[in-house]
Amino acid sequence: MGASCSSCCGGKSRDGLYDNVLADSEREAVADLLQYLENRGETDFFSGEPLRALSTLVYSENIDLQRSASLTFAEITERDVRAVDRDTLEPILFLLQNSDIEVQRAASAALGNLAVNTDNKVLIVQLGGLAPLIRQMMSPNVEVQCNAVGCITNLATHEDNKAKIARSGALGPLTRLAKSRDMRVQRNATGALLNMTHSDENRQQLVNAGAIPVLVQLLSSTDVDVQYYCTTALSNIAVDANNRRKLAQTEPRLVQSLVNLMDSSSPKVQCQAALALRNLASDEKYQLEIVRASGLGPLLRLLQSSYLPLILSAVACIRNISIHPMNESPIIEAGFLKPLVDLLGSTDNEEIQCHAISTLRNLAASSDRNKALVLEAGAVQKCKQLVLEVPVTVQSEMTAAIAVLALSDELKTNLLELGVFEVLIPLTKSPSIEVQGNSAAALGNLSSKVGDYSVFIHNWNEPSDGIHGYLSRFLASGDATFQHIAIWTLLQLLESEDKKLIGLIGKSNDIVDMIRQIANRQIESDNELEDDDEGEVVSLAQRCLELLGQGNAKAHIEG
């Protein structure tokens, strides 16, 4: 990521190279080095005699020799980057501490080039490279600043280095240089700050160093790379609840800036802006603020793009925004329903499907009107078409959405006519506990106040052992929640006053026997909440027996 700002890597002419009188060893090293440079394509400067010649120049007291050494290191590392040992790195680190600007500039360029290699990243830090780089970041020379920051940017991509950099005192200078007037310095500094946002501890160090206001300010940069680095860094910072609170208190322009960036000409910036808003929208305040900042329009455009990362970031964001009840109607009115339904079938991306159906469920949560609009948009038809084929995580979301829609008395007949039993009943046999529970909850919601119970009769034994099989399995499961769902559903069916349906239940000896066992269950628990839940299940079972004309069974309830 870090870009070198060094452009001067040339050597000096042979004639009149040095005015000062050189030691014999230095004169010999210069002659050798010039010869090696003439055959640079075939010379390994990182070992043996070439490295010894370079090192002689490095440790000379002659500034011209030191400059030549640093420029040579910068040149050879520009075209030959590989893992090197301390014998190569120590001379370069020694040059970094030189007071001469030209030496500093070339040495930091060389080190930045070598810091592209994974092994070198670790060794540079182990050999104490951070301290001189931090000093160079505070240099008045822009080229030196640029190379030093670029090197730290590269070093910060290695996990082993991040915490060391965070504790080294580098974050303050990096934050200041992020405001540099030189775009190269700014890019390198914001890139380095981004690399420091991948762990909780480092993010906190970054916040403490005062990076947040700088990153927010730079969202309005005209440079796409700076926009991307700052947007991504803020997205990572917003993962933490404490940081979101800090952002809410101190950065009133943040949301509007991110909303504006969703209309950037750069897809990577658009994507990160939506993801940053997604992370912010973990909090209620931001869920509302994004809508108020006219964020729905740009999100809808991203949602309808053909670029998968944009779709994913937008649908993840709208999912979080849709959690707030006050946002349900604005999202629906903005035209999201049909595109969300279309996403369910237009991609096999599991994450996109999960976010899309979860959003539809959220939009249906608070009002029967919105439930009807979700149904009209074709959500249930699409779920029915796909639910038996999609991954388990998507099945769980789809069945949960149907269960929510089934809470509306006005929609129950529509749902039954759409044939949801064809998928809900088989899914009560799913290997997933969540899918089983959601499917059973949907069946339970549909069993209450339907009016016409003929579909329950028709599906009593089919498909997949029908309603009968589902009730029998759940009653026998030993799971208190599953038993509760099954008994509550049974009670709705028995209260339907549909004689044929009640007759089918009464003839199902397995079901009746299990209801009787539950009705006679003794409650022995030290937990009052468990007592209440268990007591309700027993009470429902007793009520079922009464409606079956077998209400003389004695139940023994303690407590």
Swiss-Prot record:
InterPro entries: ARM-like (IPR011989), ARM-type_fold (IPR016024), Armadillo (IPR000225), Vac8 (IPR045156). One of its GO terms (biological process) is piecemeal microautophagy of the nucleus. SUPFAM superfamilies: ARM repeat. A lipid is attached at G2 (N-myristoyl glycine). It is a lipid-anchor. ARM repeats lie at residues 77-116, 118-157, 159-198, 200-239, 243-282, 284-323, 325-365, 409-448. It is found in: Vacuole membrane. GO terms for molecular function: identical protein binding; protein-membrane adaptor activity. Keywords: Lipoprotein, Membrane, Myristate, Palmitate, Repeat, Vacuole. Functions in both vacuole inheritance and protein targeting from the cytoplasm to vacuole. This is Vacuolar protein 8. It comes from Neurospora crassa (strain ATCC 24698 / 74-OR23-1A / CBS 708.71 / DSM 1257 / FGSC 987). The lineage of its organism: Eukaryota, Fungi, Dikarya, Ascomycota, Pezizomycotina. The gene is vac8.
